[in-house]
């Protein structure tokens, strides 16, 4: 579920040495499954452990995860990085904003997950986003662009060279993508 590097474990162990005996850490997600999801780590004294918590035992500590946060922390990584500017704890949780779907989930769910977790974060840099409207019986993903992508002069390139290539590579059962958007150029358009 969660990988904690040796450096991060050593950092936590040093901090925990100054806490009440038996105190461990808790890893959690606030607003899981939403665009506002935030991950955190806190101290977890022995009396704060719930029966429904998952206990993840590591060499130097135990990390507790509450029942609600657990699916959103799948594939999460905690590291303690030191460089010329100093040291910092990093927590990467790729599924915090959206729960990972199973490999055997319906095609619509798997495509939607890829759009939300991989493609929309790229488009967000330009203030854009794309939504899956449907998958036709003949295997076309019907998409609708919004935000800065609406009427952007590069939308065709983004659709065919970016999104379509990624989707077809990941989902060979798709035949292609089509744009349902009625593009109206305005100040919101990126290019």
From Swiss-Prot:
One of its GO terms (biological process) is iron-sulfur cluster assembly. It comes from the Bacteria. Binds 1 [4Fe-4S] cluster per subunit. The cluster is presumably bound at the interface of two monomers. Its cofactor is [4Fe-4S] cluster. InterPro entries: Fe/S_biogenesis_protein_NfuA, FeS_biogenesis, FSCA_dom_sf, HesB-like_dom_sf, NIF_FeS_clus_asmbl_NifU_C. Homodimer. This is Fe/S biogenesis protein NfuA. It comes from Escherichia coli O7:K1 (strain IAI39 / ExPEC). The lineage of its organism: Bacteria, Pseudomonadati, Pseudomonadota, Gammaproteobacteria, Enterobacterales.
């Amino acid at each position: 579920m969660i990988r904690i590097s040796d450096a991060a474990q050593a950092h936590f162990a040093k901090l925990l040495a100054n806490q009440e005996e038996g105190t461990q850490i808790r890893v959690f997600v606030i607003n899981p499954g939403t665009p506002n999801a935030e991950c955190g780590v806190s101290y977890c004294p022995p009396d704060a452990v719930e029966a429904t918590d998952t206990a993840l035992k590591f060499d130097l500590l135990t990390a507790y995860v509450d029942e609600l946060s657990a699916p959103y922390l799948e594939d999460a990584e905690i590291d303690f990085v030191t460089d010329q500017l100093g040291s910092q704890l990093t927590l990467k949780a790729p599924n915090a904003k959206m729960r990972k779907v199973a490999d055997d989930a319906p095609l619509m769910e798997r495509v939607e997950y890829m759009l939300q977790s991989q493609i929309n974060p790229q488009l967000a840099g330009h203030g854009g986003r794309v939504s899956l409207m449907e998958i036709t019986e003949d295997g076309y993903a019907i998409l609708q662009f919004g935000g800065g992508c609406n009427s952007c002069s590069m939308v065709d390139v983004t659709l065919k060279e970016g999104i379509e290539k990624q989707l077809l590579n990941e989902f060979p059962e798709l035949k292609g993508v089509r744009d349902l958007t009625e593009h109206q150029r305005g100040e919101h358009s990126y290019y």
